[in-house]
């Protein structure tokens, strides 16, 4: 059984307050995009191991047992001891450390895949409860529809938003942005206007009203990321922003851009139609 975990972008990201537990409350809009990994699970014939994990495509750091798809399997195995041994094959196309939620999407899709393959009978709500244990934004990918996210990115409210007909260009430079450092530079401020209201306005107004709070500190430290955003606007983007804490930057366009890869040499560069 195979599935295709997709990425997401953040439309705006406001850090609104620091919590007593040291985390930050935020507000953002998660929007799914058609940039996908591939995840396949097969019944393991040899029962000498509970699982094996084979990763191809973009390289991933870390040990297999720390990968979120393995953590998802172990989480369900704890409650369903009869879960059979599996071979997990994952092709990574969504770049890691990009603010695109690739790892979270893989984990959520693993939960859905195991539920279907082994007929666990989990409801959507129950799968969301499992997913949030693996990461704040994991549960988003269970329903995989646009949401207004609050809390630490784990509380969701559906939003009526469709970007169908637009095209997205996604750029990921070979730069690692520490999420911890990015948060350390933030001074939380509650926005005067909620993102829920901003996205109801024409996209042409978003440039001046919808902001990612991480951009100020990240762009100061990595001006080359800021330059990517500027270049996307120069190419005609209606709206451009960094996703999450970076380092990926996206631009939303009314039509496809030809030969865009030539303009961002040395970067991960993909163009997709939005749905």
UniProtKB/Swiss-Prot annotation:
Q: What is this protein called?
A: 4-diphosphocytidyl-2-C-methyl-D-erythritol kinase
Enzyme class, first EC level, given as a word: transferase
Give the GO biological process terms: isopentenyl diphosphate biosynthetic process, methylerythritol 4-phosphate pathway; terpenoid biosynthetic process
Per its UniProt record, what SUPFAM superfamilies does this chain match?
Answer: GHMP Kinase, C-terminal domain, Ribosomal protein S5 domain 2-like
Q: Which domain of life is it from?
A: Bacteria
The record describes the protein's role as: Catalyzes the phosphorylation of the position 2 hydroxy group of 4-diphosphocytidyl-2C-methyl-D-erythritol.
> Which residues of this protein are catalytic?
8, 137
Q: What family does the database annotate?
A: Belongs to the GHMP kinase family. IspE subfamily.
Q: Which residues form the signal peptide?
A: none
Name the Pfam families for this protein.
GHMP_kinases_C, GHMP_kinases_N
Q: Where does ATP bind?
A: 95-105
| GO MF entries | 4-(cytidine 5'-diphospho)-2-C-methyl-D-erythritol kinase activity; ATP binding
Record bears the keyword Nucleotide-binding = yes
């Amino acid at each position: 059984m195979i599935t295709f975990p997709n990425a997401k972008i953040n439309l705006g990201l406001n850090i609104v307050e620091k919590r007593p537990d040291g985390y930050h409350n935020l507000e953002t809009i998660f929007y799914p995009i058609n940039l996908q990994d591939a995840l396949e699970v097969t019944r393991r014939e040899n029962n000498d191991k509970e699982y094996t994990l084979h990763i191809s495509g973009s390289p991933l750091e870390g040990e297999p047992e720390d990968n979120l798809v393995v953590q998802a399997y172990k989480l369900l195995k704890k409650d369903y001891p009869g879960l059979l041994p599996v071979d997990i094959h994952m092709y990574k196309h969504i770049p890691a450390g990009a603010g695109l939620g690739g790892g979270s999407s893989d984990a959520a899709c693993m939960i859905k895949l195991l539920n279907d393959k082994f007929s666990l009978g989990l409801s959507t709500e129950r799968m969301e409860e499992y997913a949030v244990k693996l990461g704040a934004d994991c549960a988003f990918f269970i329903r995989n529809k646009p949401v207004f996210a609050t809390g630490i990115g784990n509380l969701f409210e559906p939003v009526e938003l469709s970007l169908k007909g637009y095209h997205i260009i996604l750029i990921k430079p070979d730069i690692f942005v520490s999420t911890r450092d990015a948060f350390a530079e933030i001074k939380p401020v509650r926005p005067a206007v909620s993102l829920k209201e901003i996205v109801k306005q024409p996209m042409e107004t978003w440039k001046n009203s919808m902001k990612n709070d991480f951009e100020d500190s990240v762009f100061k430290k990595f001006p080359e990321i800021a330059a990517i955003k500027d270049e996307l606007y120069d190419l005609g983007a209606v709206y451009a922003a960094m996703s999450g804490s970076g380092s990926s930057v996206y631009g939303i366009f009314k039509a496809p851009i030809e030969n865009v890869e030539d303009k961002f040499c040395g970067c991960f560069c993909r163009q997709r139609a939005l749905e």
